[in-house]
Amino acid sequence: MFGVLNSNDHRAAVQQRNIPAFGRTSFEPWTDNPTSNYRCETGGNGRDSGQNRVRRPMNAFMVWSRDQRRKVALENPQMQNSEISKQLGYQWRMLTEAEKWPFFEEAQRLQAMHREKYPDYKYRPRRKALPQKSDKLLPAASSSMLCRQVLVDEKWYPFTYRDSCSRAAHSPMEDQLSSSRPVNIANSLLQQEHHYRSTSLGDSPETLAAHLSADPPFYPKEQLGLSDAYFP
């Protein structure tokens, strides 16, 4: 009932079935056909997503480096693509105009074919991604210097406050001047306080000294920016 198949016939039938399937699934990234550059690719930036994007026609350098890149990659399998591109660019610059001329002619022919095949083609370069700005760190600029006023005995006295970021960018001379400024403010405030009390109170010097020692003036060091409360 069942016929016996010959082993040679069975092997030939299997090979005949596998050859078309292999031909459909095989892919060669580098081909010698210049028209392979016109194949459309899917993807790209946001506006080309999901649509077929037409590649630009090859220029003279691309025509020349198409075979040279494969040759360098086979000779140096450990070399990265960026290094291969640098080496190819150096070799291209070393060629003479006579050596480059055949590749320019081939590039012109490919561009003419590209214009005939895609008459409405327009080159649209991809947009470069802009670096994201971070607002976490503020630069040590003049904006970090805060000018405030202190109310002492119904009078406003300006003073300057600097944060830790701007203080690190100042010179030693500026630090010395800024450290001596609060002391001068304290001295002037004391002198004004003594003058105010001496004019408002018509008492003897002994009574005035006793009153000052019993009721010293209060100057908050947080507002004045003093490291230590210094009073002569």
Curated annotation (Swiss-Prot):
It is found in: Nucleus speckle; Cytoplasm; Nucleus. InterPro entries: HMG_box_dom, HMG_box_dom_sf, SRY, SRY-related_HMG-box_TF-like. GO terms for molecular function: calmodulin binding; DNA-binding transcription activator activity, RNA polymerase II-specific; RNA polymerase II cis-regulatory region sequence-specific DNA binding. Gene3D superfamilies: High mobility group box domain (1.10.30.10). The keyword RNA-binding does not apply. GO terms for biological process: cell differentiation; male sex determination; sex differentiation. Its main location: nucleus. Pfam families: HMG_box. Disulfide bonds: none annotated. Residues 24-53, 196-215 are annotated as: Disordered. GO terms for cellular component: cytoplasm; nuclear speck; nucleus. Keywords: Activator, Calmodulin-binding, Cytoplasm, Differentiation, DNA-binding, Nucleus, Sexual differentiation, Transcription, Transcription regulation. Residues 54-122 bind DNA. CDD domains: HMG-box_SoxA_SRY. Transcriptional regulator that controls a genetic switch in male development. It is necessary and sufficient for initiating male sex determination by directing the development of supporting cell precursors (pre-Sertoli cells) as Sertoli rather than granulosa cells. Involved in different aspects of gene regulation including promoter activation or repression. Binds to the DNA consensus sequence 5'-[AT]AACAA[AT]-3'. SRY HMG box recognizes DNA by partial intercalation in the minor groove and promotes DNA bending. Also involved in pre-mRNA splicing. Belongs to the SRY family. Interacts with CALM, EP300, HDAC3, KPNB1, ZNF208 isoform KRAB-O, PARP1, SLC9A3R2 and WT1. The interaction with EP300 modulates its DNA-binding activity. The interaction with KPNB1 is sensitive to dissociation by Ran in the GTP-bound form. Interaction with PARP1 impaired its DNA-binding activity. This is Sex-determining region Y protein. It comes from Pusa caspica (Caspian seal).
